[in-house]
Amino acid sequence: MATKSFHRTDRVSAQVRRDLGTIVHAAVRDHGLPSVSVSDVEISRDLAHAKVFVTALQQERSAEAVKGLKDIAGQLRTQLARAMKLRHVPELHFHYDDSVDRGERIDNLLRDLDDVGPGATSSDEDAEQR
């Protein structure tokens, strides 16, 4: 029976994602930033750095949102330190997570293929059949 091993970094990143999600939600409102949500957190093995991936509800304002979060990263880290019981809270590095945008683009492409339908042929196939 194989047991799945969990590393401390996995547990800490999950906790950071939960706590930081709440903190970022409040900070966005307080600082007038575009609305974002924390989608993932990757923490270095030494727990010194955390890559925080965020998604913006308004894609066109994503750069503004990430810049605003980078500007207040120190404040967010202080609030995170109060919420978590860690000796050392990782330094926060914010990045835009474009996986949702890429997923929507792929979904739209697949939907367009469905609209063409299985009975439709391209002009190249029509030329070959003649």
UniProtKB/Swiss-Prot annotation:
One of its GO terms (cellular component) is cytosol. GO terms for molecular function: ribosomal small subunit binding. Residues 111-130 are annotated as: Disordered. Keywords: Cytoplasm, Ribosome biogenesis. The gene is rbfA. Disulfide bonds: none annotated. Monomer. Binds 30S ribosomal subunits, but not 50S ribosomal subunits or 70S ribosomes. Its main location: cytoplasm. One of several proteins that assist in the late maturation steps of the functional core of the 30S ribosomal subunit. Associates with free 30S ribosomal subunits (but not with 30S subunits that are part of 70S ribosomes or polysomes). Required for efficient processing of 16S rRNA. May interact with the 5'-terminal helix region of 16S rRNA. Belongs to the RbfA family. It comes from Xanthomonas oryzae pv. oryzae (strain KACC10331 / KXO85). It comes from the Bacteria. This is Ribosome-binding factor A.
